[in-house]
Amino acid sequence: MSGAVAEARALVGVPFRLHGRSPERGLDCVGLAALVLKRAAPEGYGLRSGDEGRASEWLRAAGLRRVEAAREGDLALVRPGPLQLHLMIVVSGGHVHAHAGVGRVVEMPGPSPWPVIGYWRAE
């Protein structure tokens, strides 16, 4: 198990908070990814625009590279709705992500229920 996966699983149960950046106050998907991958999170972003190009720019600026096949610890950029993007951490048998509907960070078994746009890896 990678360090990113262990870190992600340790955060399961942390409350969801839009633009959240700390386990004490809550996390959103960007805050979770930044914390787990030890990267700076963008400020003033909006994933509800559905702009894949802009999301890709942020991911590259954070030192991540796009990969064809996912492995544990990678980020999955997914599209839960027509104008919405979301980040999830790939773990064995599923994903860890900040789930707004459930109100906390969760581990979700199985493949993504949403279309996967791409996978990103920290180097």
Protein language model regions, located:
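...with weaker cross-activation on analogous glycine-rich loops/strands in unrelated enzymes
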Residues: S2, A41-V105, P109-G110, A122-E123
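Non-catalytic ligand/cofactor/substrate-binding and regulatory segments of enzyme domains
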Residues: M1-P15, P109-E123
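Short secondary-structure junctions and interdomain/linker hinges
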Residues: P15-L18, R66
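Short, hydrophobic secondary-structure boundary micro-motifs
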Residues: R17-G20, G44
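Active-site nucleophilic cysteine motif
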Residues: G20-K38
